[in-house]
């Protein structure tokens, strides 16, 4: 099911290209419950368009490890009034972690940079994803989001 997949179907890439060609400068996809790639594509008129296919869940009480990793984008947009152009001049992805205790209690969100192995070892999602750890989250992030968009 592509809605839960970190991979992208051609339909999403084609739709992003259409939106870019129709004039979008930034495209943010939603719904898959997991993070998906971030990239620049070129619109028909030559503009560079930022595409964020999915930021995943910001906060949820779902029961699978990959759905605990979400993200926020920090985007700088620059407008040149003389040339009448607008462009994304900086785009950085910050990982977030939805954390909950056993029985889906005490749900909260952390920046991935502030998350620890100790927290991960107590996460309620370990009942369905025993391998869940800080390394698991960092590996997932680096597998999906290219270094160009990662902070640090």
What are these regions (language model features)?
Residues 65-152:
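A short C-terminal boundary segment appended to hydrolase-like catalytic domains
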Residues 13-71:
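Conserved beta-sheet core of the metallophosphoesterase superfamily
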């Amino acid at each position: 099911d592509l809605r839960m997949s970190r991979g992208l179907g051609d339909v999403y890439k084609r739709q992003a290209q259409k939106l870019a060609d129709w004039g979008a400068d930034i495209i943010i996809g939603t719904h898959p419950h997991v993070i998906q790639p971030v990239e620049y594509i070129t619109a028909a008129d030559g503009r560079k368009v930022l595409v964020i296919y999915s930021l995943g869940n910001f906060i949820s009480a779902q029961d699978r490890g990959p759905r605990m990793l979400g993200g926020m984008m920090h985007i700088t947009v620059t407008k040149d009034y003389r040339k009448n152009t607008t462009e994304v001049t900086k785009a950085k992805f910050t990982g977030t972690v939805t954390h909950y205790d056993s029985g889906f209690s005490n749900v909260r969100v952390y920046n991935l940079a502030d998350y620890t192995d100790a927290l991960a070892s107590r996460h309620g999602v370990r009942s369905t994803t025993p391998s869940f750890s800080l390394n698991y989250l960092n590996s997932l992030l680096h597998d999906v989001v290219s270094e160009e968009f990662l902070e640090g």
